[in-house]
Amino acid sequence: MLIFLWCGAVCVSLLGAANIPPHPLNLINFMEMIRYTIPCEKTWGEYADYGCYCGAGGSGRPIDALDRCCYVHDNCYGDAEKKHKCNPKTQSYSYKLTKRTIICYGAAGTCGRIVCDCDRTAALCFGNSEYIEGHKNIDTARFCQ
């Protein structure tokens, strides 16, 4: 009886999970890189709505060094799309987290390597930039013109 209940719970759990759309693989890789480089008390999600460029879209001038990391990352993705015909949000790539740095694998000039380098540069930039609480959830209409 116990085995039947356990199997039923697993099947229901798997069926429920089947309706959840997967995150694009690259975004999962990028989140892992960010978690590796930022201070322990922060979560990657705290960077998702920061300044004028960290999060969806972006406009105006970056408001600080951390926001500039996101601005550069956005432009890097834009270049990958326009110049190299890559799709950064779904591009898979190989990398290694080691000794407080990130190593991207793959041949130079390939979409995987280009996108990995964009994410690597941004994640390391996040780790070296001050996080200012007052720059989270700012009024972008007011401060990002």
UniProtKB/Swiss-Prot annotation:
**What does the record give as the reaction this protein catalyses?**
a 1,2-diacyl-sn-glycero-3-phosphocholine + H2O = a 1-acyl-sn-glycero-3-phosphocholine + a fatty acid + H(+)
Q: Does the keyword Signal apply?
A: yes
Name of a matching Pfam family: Phospholip_A2_1
Q: GO cellular component terms?
A: extracellular region
Q: Which UniProt keywords apply?
A: Calcium, Disulfide bond, Hydrolase, Lipid degradation, Lipid metabolism, Metal-binding, Neurotoxin, Presynaptic neurotoxin, Secreted, Signal, Toxin
Gene Ontology terms describing biological process: arachidonate secretion; lipid catabolic process; phospholipid metabolic process
Q: Which residues form the propeptide?
A: 18-25
| Subcellular location as annotated | Secreted
Spell out the disulfide connections: 52-144, 54-70, 76-118, 86-111, 104-116
The UniProt record gives the binding positions of Ca(2+) as 53, 55, 57
Q: Which cofactor does it need?
A: Ca(2+)
Q: What is its main location?
A: secreted
Q: What family is reported?
A: Belongs to the phospholipase A2 family. Group I subfamily. G49 sub-subfamily.
The protein here is known as: Basic phospholipase A2 beta-bungarotoxin A-AL1 chain
